[in-house]
Regions:
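Non-Sec secretion/translocation targeting segments of pathogen effectors
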Residues: 1-11, 15, 447-448
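Glycine-rich flexible loop motifs, especially short His-Gly-Gly/GGXG/HXGH segments used as catalytic or interaction
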Residues: 388-448
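A structural signal for short, hydrophobic/glycine-enriched beta-strand patches
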Residues: 10-402
C-alpha cells in the first residue's frame, strides 16, 4: 500500500492539509457520554485520500489506516458495505427552468465529483456480489436560507395558496397572487413584523397552542430576513417594500434538494457508464432500476451534523428490514431502539466526500455513527485548484473547531437522536439563534 506524496511542488498546501488532518485524527474516538471509561472506544477507520499523503502523516495518525483507491482495504469495504453515503456540498441557486419553478439549483463541482464516485463504487459493489447495498444521498441547505424556509408559511398565506404549492409556482405568479391578496384580503406583512419585534405576545398562551407557536416562529424568521438586509428597516418600511424584500429573498431560495439532484445525476452517470461498457438497454435498465430502488434521499439538512443525524435512522432501518424485521414496525421504532437491536451486528459504511470537507466528515461520522460501524472514507476527484482547496479547507477547519466544541462541550453527547433534536431546536425552534449569529460564530471561531 502506497499513499505517499510523489511531488512536493505545492508544499504550503500539503503542510496545511496534513496539519489539519493531524488535529482531526487526535480528536477521534471521543465519547462525552462515557468520560470515565478507562479504555477509549475504537473502530476500524480507513481513509482513501485522493491526493497522496506523506509517511510522516501516516505515522502521526496511527488511529487511521491509509489506503489506495485500488487497495485491498477498499475492495473489502465495498464488497461488505451496508451503505454508501454521498455527502452533499452546498448548492448554487440559478434561474429556475421554464415550466419547472422548483428546479432552480445547480450542483457544485464537489457534489458532482462525489456523485460520480458513488456511482462507480455502487457498480464495484454489485460486481463483487454485494447487490443489496444501500445508497444515501444527503441534502444541504445553506444556513442563510433557514429564515426563508421557516417563513415559508407566511409567504404561502400572503399568496393565498397552500405551503406545499409555493415552490411549484413561478416567481411572477407568486408576486401576482401576493399583490392580489393584499388588496382583496388586506393581508399586511407589517402587522406580522411588528408582532415579532415586540414582547406583547403571551408566551404561556403561545406555548399552549402549537399553531400559535408555529406562527410566532414564522414571524420571527420573517423579521430576521429583514434585519439581515442593509436596505430595509423592518419597523419603518412600507408594506410594499416588505413584500418586495420577501419576494427577493424567496427568489434566491433553493427549491429542490441537492439529494434529489445527486440521485438523478448518479442514475444518469451509471447508465452512461454501462452504455459505454457495451451493456444492452435491458441490462442497463435492470441495474439502474435496482439502484433507484436501493437509493434513499436524506431530507435537506443545515449542516454536516444534521446530514448524519438524519441519515443514521434511515441506514439502521434499512438494515433491520434486510434482517427480516417488519418494515411497519421498524418505522415506529426510535433511533435508540434501532441502535440497540443492531449493537452486535457489524456494519460497514463507505462515505464519499471532497478533499476539503473530508477531515470534518471523518470526525463527525466517527462521533455520531454507532460503534458497530466500520468506516471507510473515500475522497472524490474534485478538480479544484490547490488555492481553492486550501481556502475551502480553512473554512472547514473553522467549522470543525466550532462544531466539535458545540457537540462535545455544549451538547455533551454523541447519541445521534439527541444531537439531532438539539440541533433542530437550535436551527428551527422558537429559541433558535439568528442566521447572522450563526455566521458570526463561524467567522469568529478561532482555530486552536
Amino acid at each position: 500500500m502506497s499513499t505517499e506524496r510523489i511531488s512536493s511542488s505545492h508544499e504550503p498546501f500539503e503542510q496545511y492539509r496534513e496539519s489539519y488532518l493531524t488535529k482531526v485524527a487526535e480528536k477521534l474516538y471521543q465519547d462525552p457520554d462515557h468520560p470515565k471509561e478507562k479504555e477509549p472506544r475504537s473502530r476500524s477507520i480507513v481513509y482513501v485520500p485522493y491526493h497522496g499523503v506523506s509517511e510522516h502523516l501516516q505515522q502521526n495518525c496511527p488511529k487511521i489506516v491509509f489506503a489506495d483507491s485500488a487497495g485491498q482495504e477498499v475492495v473489502e469495504a465495498v464488497a461488505e458495505a451496508d451503505v454508501i453515503i454521498n455527502i452533499a456540498r452546498g448548492e448554487e441557486v440559478i434561474e429556475a427552468e421554464i415550466d419547472h419553478p422548483d428546479r432552480n439549483v445547480k450542483l457544485p463541482p464537489e457534489s458532482l465529483a462525489n456523485t460520480e464516485m458513488v456511482g462507480d463504487l455502487y457498480l464495484q459493489a454489485i460486481e463483487s456480489g454485494n447487490t443489496n447495498v444501500q445508497v444515501v444521498h444527503t441534502g444541504r441547505m445553506n444556513n442563510r436560507t433557514i429564515a426563508m424556509a421557516t417563513a415559508m408559511p407566511i409567504l404561502a398565506e400572503s399568496a393565498g395558496i397552500n405551503c406545499e404549492d409555493v415552490i411549484h409556482t413561478s416567481d411572477v405568479k407568486i408576486r401576482q397572487l401576493v399583490e392580489k391578496n393584499q388588496v382583496e384580503n388586506q393581508v399586511d406583512l407589517k402587522d406580522l413584523v411588528h408582532e415579532a419585534g415586540t414582547n406583547e405576545v403571551d408566551d404561556d398562551e403561545v406555548n399552549a397552542d402549537p399553531k400559535k407557536q408555529e406562527m410566532q416562529i414564522c414571524a420571527r424568521a420573517l423579521r430576521r430576513i429583514y434585519e439581515a438586509r442593509d436596505d430595509i428597516d423592518p419597523d419603518t418600511a412600507s408594506s410594499s417594500k416588505l413584500t418586495d424584500a420577501l419576494l427577493d429573498e424567496y427568489r434566491r431560495y433553493p427549491r429542490i434538494s441537492t439529494s434529489t439532484l445527486m440521485k438523478e445525476q448518479m442514475l444518469q452517470n451509471v447508465a452512461e457508464k454501462l452504455r459505454g461498457e457495451g451493456k444492452n438497454k435491458k441490462e442497463i435498465n435492470e441495474i439502474v432500476e435496482k439502484l433507484d430502488e436501493f437509493t434513499d434521499e436524506e431530507p435537506d439538512s443545515v449542516d454536516t451534523v444534521t446530514n448524519f443525524t438524519n441519515s443514521i435512522p434511515m441506514i439502521l432501518a434499512n438494515k433491520l428490514v434486510k434482517d427480516g424485521y417488519n418494515a411497519d414496525e421498524v418505522g415506529l421504532m426510535s433511533t435508540e431502539q434501532k441502535m440497540k437491536l443492531l449493537a452486535d451486528s457489524e456494519m460497514t459504511a463507505v462515505i464519499v466526500a471532497d478533499t476539503a470537507h473530508m477531515p470534518r466528515v471523518m470526525w463527525l461520522a466517527d462521533y455520531l455513527m454507532p460503534d458497530n460501524f466500520k468506516l471507510t472514507f473515500i475522497e472524490s476527484r474534485t478538480g479544484l485548484s490547490e488555492d481553492m482547496l486550501q481556502k475551502s479547507m480553512e473554512r472547514e477547519e473553522r467549522s470543525f473547531g466550532l462544531g466539535s466544541n458545540w457537540l462535545l462541550n455544549q451538547m455533551g453527547t454523541r447519541n445521534p437522536a439527541r444531537v439531532g433534536e438539539l440541533a433542530d431546536n437550535a436551527y428551527w425552534g422558537k429559541d433558535s439563534v439568528s442566521n447572522d449569529e450563526i455566521n458570526k460564530k463561524i467567522n469568529e471561531q478561532k482555530v486552536n
